Amino acid sequence: MSGAESLASSPLNDLSWWHADADERERTFARHRREDPRPFVRVSAQSESGFWALTRHEDILEVSRRPEDFTSGDGGTQIFDQPAELREYRGSIIDMDNPEHARLRKIVSRGFTVRSLQALRSDIEDTVREIISELPADGRCDFVTDLAAPLPLRIISNMLGIPREHEQFIFEATNVILGASDAEYIPDQTGAGINKAVTAASVGLIELLEDLAKDRIANPTGDVISQLVAADDENLTPAEMAKFFILLVGAGNETTRNAITHGMIALTDHPDQRELWRADYDSYAVSADEEIFRWATPVIHFRRTVARDGVMLGEQELTKGEKVVLFYNSGNRDESVFEDPYTFDVTRNPNPHVAFGAAGPHFCLGAHLARLELQVLFKILFEELPDLAAAGEPDLLRSNFLHGVKHLQATYTPR
């Protein structure tokens, strides 16, 4: 494959490949979409085991719509099976199949309807303005830790009824859990070191939840935790609630903060698009929002497992137990679906991106909340800090699962 490496010869579990050259990586995925869209990637040159890498938008959609053939509950949804000692904490609804998945999703979705989230708009607006008021007075900040991370974290904390004093702990714990392959968050990068740190962070979050749940049973407030512990036959078990809590505080702040940060980088790098949106915000609010999610693709991949022998994907026959990895980053650059996919275009419409997963039972539960947070945030930023811009290169998370940004210097004229 001249001009690009082969995915099959460059294992996608090799973190150095993901961080060596972004342009080379994009060329590799593009070449595969054209010539070899479903390569079998071996975990090492000496191993026969591996996974099928799906690089085309249509394959990602198809697999997502066929949960009876491609399961989520067999070993988890990341490339490698989770260690047994972590499954107790990490197995949430994203790692389940129906009917259990449908039962739990119905319960936890009570607090995430479009109607209930629209009622949060004023809370989000107030939170954005509060965060802006806390920015350093010298006109320089770490956009991630000072702005992008606090917004979704405070909103999800408010929804759950988590007191503000726990905010920093949740930020640090979710960094450990979702950024486990990065030495900034877990210095001991041995398998034992990672498992120990992730377990400790997970246990800390569960202990926080247990304290909150006990309080809500005695003193219900109407927040999401109060709804989940309300006495009815469909309630979550304590173990189910613990896993959901870890998922919600993690996905509810990590993925959104990364979309926000990549959005700021894109708007800085494409000032014409920034000005177009700023000058007529309402006309482009929805399309710009969706383009940021496509451009960012905060979650790089999820995995499915083949449910039985003889499952067909296109002309490829698959075997029970084989792993199939959906590379959303590649699907969101598919030239057969998106015109000029490497162009950031706030007017792009339609925009059938797969940044929230694809159609099917596992479409992101928090998609509506994430969209609302971005729409509100950038509107207020354009009004309050019109010259806010990224300054320098982002410090990227070492991961092949999350397209994360740990730090991003930014400048602005103080208010």
Question: Residue spans of the language-model regions?
Answer:
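Cytochrome P450
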Residues: 1-415
